[in-house]
Amino acid sequence: MKIAYVVSSKKKCGPNIVILNIVKELANKHEMEIFFLDESDDDVFECVNVKSTQIKKASDLKEHLKRFDIIHSSGIRPDALVVLCKVIYRVKCKIITTIHNYVFQDLYYSYGLVKSLIGGLLWCSIWLFFDKLVILSKNADNYYWFLPSAKKNIIYNGIDDNDCLQNKKCNYRKEFNIPDDGILAGSCANLTKRKGIDLVIQTLTKEHKIYYIVAGNGIEKHNLINLVKARKLHERVYFIDFLDEPESFMSQLDVFLMPSRSEGFGLTVLESTKLGIPVITSNIPIFMELFDQMCLTFDIKNPSTLIDVITYAKKNRLHLSQKFHAIFQDRFTSSKMATKYENVYNNLFREVL
């Protein structure tokens, strides 16, 4: 098969990591090429021997896509361009997209009610033209009840389960003078309201021996810093910039926190579990489905419960990390994910013949 991937850019982000892991697993079996729209400082695909081509306009993409059997896009602009090529330019291939979010919730937390409704309806309309839609969970399948059932496939995300831990570039306990008996918690996120970092900050006090490091940037970062100042937690909560390789940071934590109000999947949960770090998530439905018995949870409507859960995770770290890692290997490896995507590609390819 000849498979093309169309993405917004080559920067490191959740949807691109999913594409990367599919390519890693299947590139030796199929002809592949990655098309991207925007330049970026980093290139998540540089580790794979697959050609990548920048697209400036839809007509350029049309000429490229004529060579492929399957087109797999990710993101609103790539989705729109692929549909344009399929419907307007009559490119004869099968098209598939992965829906990584809960579109109305996701856009609401970033852009507000009006833009989320307009953007969400537009994006959902675009999805109707695809031959296949990959949904990341049963919960998301129910959320998108209005999309044709025959087009939807549920495939859980997966990550590479090989050991790829880099040398420590920074000792975070030493950097922030965190005592040996302090519990070091952390999160990696694009800092928006949806990620729920404020819930953790509002729960912590100086009386607790819990220290919290937040790795990431985003529109909410300034507000979070001000919240830390208002609660006088500058000796408990610290911010560092987005990390291209977060594994070293995660490996130094006692517990990883994922306090999201809404989430499409949560790849950092898998990354932390792979490293043997216990994970605590909010009890939103998507996490309860995906990570049942693989993570600890706290009540998002009663965030004060988080303190007890963090303390429990620290005391039982060894047992929890072994238990959670075994479940990760059973459910969420990139090889399992890629096999399911390949099955979808094969079914579409038979329709092309």
Swiss-Prot record:
A GO CC term assigned to this protein in UniProt: membrane
Activity-pH dependence: Optimum pH is 7-8. Retains 24% of maximal activity at pH 5 and 14% of activity at pH 9.
Recorded metabolic or biological pathway in which this protein acts: Bacterial outer membrane biogenesis; LPS O-antigen biosynthesis
Effect caused by changing residue 217 to D: No effect on glycosyl transferase activity or donor specificity. Higher Glc- and Gal-transferase activity than wild-type. Lower Glc-transferase activity, but significantly higher GlcNAc-transferase activity compared to wild-type
Pfam families associated with the record: Glyco_transf_4 (PF13439), Glycos_transf_1 (PF00534)
Result when mutating residue 161 to A: No effect on activity or donor specificity
Chain sites annotated for binding UDP: 190, 271
Annotated membrane topology: Single-pass membrane protein
Enzyme category, top tier: transferase
TM regions (residue ranges): 116-136
Knockout consequences: Loss of LPS O-antigen production.
CDD domains: GT4_PimA-like
GO BP: Gram-negative-bacterium-type cell outer membrane assembly; lipopolysaccharide biosynthetic process; O antigen biosynthetic process
GO molecular function, one term: glucosyltransferase activity
PANTHER family: GLYCOSYLTRANSFERASE (PTHR12526)
Further comment: According to PubMed:32421169, the hydrophopic domain of this protein is likely to play a role in stabilizing the association of it with peripheral membrane or possibly, with the hydrophobic moiety of the acceptor substrate. However, a transmembrane domain is predicted by a program.
Protein name per UniProt: O-antigen biosynthesis glycosyltransferase WclY
